[in-house]
């Protein structure tokens, strides 16, 4: 498994363990989970990355595409996309398939009204 310390080889669609937030409030995701990098590869040099958290508790929908992660179906919460310092990212957990990345793109376009 690749460490998050090697960010220069990271690409859109990579999945990392997300370290627990210290002060999640309201409906913000808490606890241990994963995050999908949704930021364009051309901007990986920035000090923060755009990531979308995952959950096993939400129902699949157009804005919660389902991906397979370590043999389990999880949903990507694209409406909760946020900027994080790459140092908040833990271990590399995998990479989305091309089909999964297309579903993420569709969900992001819907949530951001980019159609």
Language model region names:
Residues 1-115:
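Conserved functional hotspots at enzyme active or ligand-binding sites that engage polyanionic ligands
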């Amino acid at each position: 498994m690749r460490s998050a310390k090697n960010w220069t080889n990271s690409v859109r669609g990579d999945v990392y363990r997300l370290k627990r937030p210290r002060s999640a409030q309201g409906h913000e995701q808490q606890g241990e989970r994963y995050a999908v990098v949704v930021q364009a590869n051309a901007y990986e040099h920035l000090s923060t990355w755009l990531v979308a958290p995952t959950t096993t508790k939400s129902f699949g929908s157009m804005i919660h595409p389902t991906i397979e992660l370590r043999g389990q179906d999880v949903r990507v919460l694209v409406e909760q996309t946020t900027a994080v310092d790459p140092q908040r990212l833990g271990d590399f957990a995998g990479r989305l398939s091309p089909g999964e990345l297309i579903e993420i793109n569709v969900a992001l376009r819907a949530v951001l009204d980019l159609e």
